[in-house]
Every structure is written in C-alpha cells, then in structure tokens.
UniProtKB/Swiss-Prot annotation:
This is Active regulator of SIRT1. The modification Citrulline is found at R7. InterPro entries: AROS. Keywords: Citrullination, Nucleus, Phosphoprotein. Widely expressed (at protein level). Citrullinated by PADI4. Part of the small subunit (SSU) processome, composed of more than 70 proteins and the RNA chaperone small nucleolar RNA (snoRNA) U3. Interacts with RPS19; the interaction is direct and mediates the integration of RPS19 in state post-A1. Interacts with SIRT1. One of its GO terms (biological process) is ribosomal small subunit biogenesis. The gene is RPS19BP1. The keyword Nucleotide-binding does not apply. Part of the small subunit (SSU) processome, first precursor of the small eukaryotic ribosomal subunit. During the assembly of the SSU processome in the nucleolus, many ribosome biogenesis factors, an RNA chaperone and ribosomal proteins associate with the nascent pre-rRNA and work in concert to generate RNA folding, modifications, rearrangements and cleavage as well as targeted degradation of pre-ribosomal RNA by the RNA exosome. Acts as a chaperone that specifically mediates the integration of RPS19 in state post-A1. Direct regulator of SIRT1. The modification Phosphoserine is found at S84. It is found in: Nucleus, Nucleolus.
Length: 136
C-alpha cells in the first residue's frame, strides 16, 4: 500500500478512537462554533490526493487490479480458433534450431546391433572333417 493510503486509514482510525467522556459526565455545550473558512480549506486539502485531479482509489479495486488472473480459458479459445497446421519439415527445423550444441541436448543416435555370426561350415562338413582327421 502507498504511504498516502496508510496515512488516510490511520486518520480515520484515530478519529473513531478519539478519547470520549464517560457517559455519566456530560459537558455543557454552548452554541456550535463556526469554523473559519481557512480551516475548512485546509481540511479539504488534506483529504485530497497530492496529484491534481486524482480521485482516491478504492483498496478493493486496487487489489482486484493486481490480483493474479487465470488466462487459461482465453488462451484455449485463441488456440482452438487458430487451427493452422504446420508442415512436419518446418516443425522439425524449428526443433533442431532450438536444440543446443551440447551433447546433452542432442538426441541419442541408435546403434544397430550386430547379428551373431553363424558358422560357414555345415554339420556334414564337420562330420567329414572329423572322419578325415581322427580316422574313425
């Protein structure tokens, strides 16, 4: 809150909490005293804001103005109204440009698994070799 608003609030509270006489002791009052114009003008000057032509603002209005608003519905309306589809190549290019040059930002390249190497020889070749080598 601004200092002017605090001062105004304190003035209002001070006026309501002014020392009052106990109810049993009433002072005899005479005719009401007229305040001179000068004091009225000074009091009116105090109530006015310091800037020319400004109207005192409500604290609730100030709060509502600064209060966080949820823009989800407005954003969703906007997004659903604009249904322009972008080409896949364009979107991939945008994603590529937004990626950094560090290794952690780059996609992992998939490595191809090597197939298990099979034997060149067949079972018959092994049996033939066994008979020639061992002679059985």
């Amino acid at each position: 809150m601004s200092a002017a608003l605090l001062r105004r609030g304190l003035e209002l509270l001070a006026a309501s909490e002014a020392p009052r006489d106990p109810p049993g002791q009433a002072k005899p009052r005479g005719a009401p005293v007229k305040r001179p114009r000068k004091t009225k003008a000074i009091q009116a000057q105090k109530l006015r804001n310091s800037a020319k032509g400004k109207v005192p603002k409500s604290a609730l209005d100030e709060y509502r103005k600064r209060e966080c608003r949820d823009h989800l519905r407005v954003n969703l309306k906007f997004l659903t109204r604009t249904r322009s589809t972008v080409a896949e190549s364009v979107s991939q290019q945008i994603l590529r440009q937004n990626r950094g040059r560090k290794a952690c930002d780059r996609p992992v390249a998939k490595t191809k698994k090597k197939k298990a190497e099979g034997t060149v020889f067949t079972e018959e070749d092994f049996q033939k070799f066994q008979q020639e080598y061992f002679g059985s």
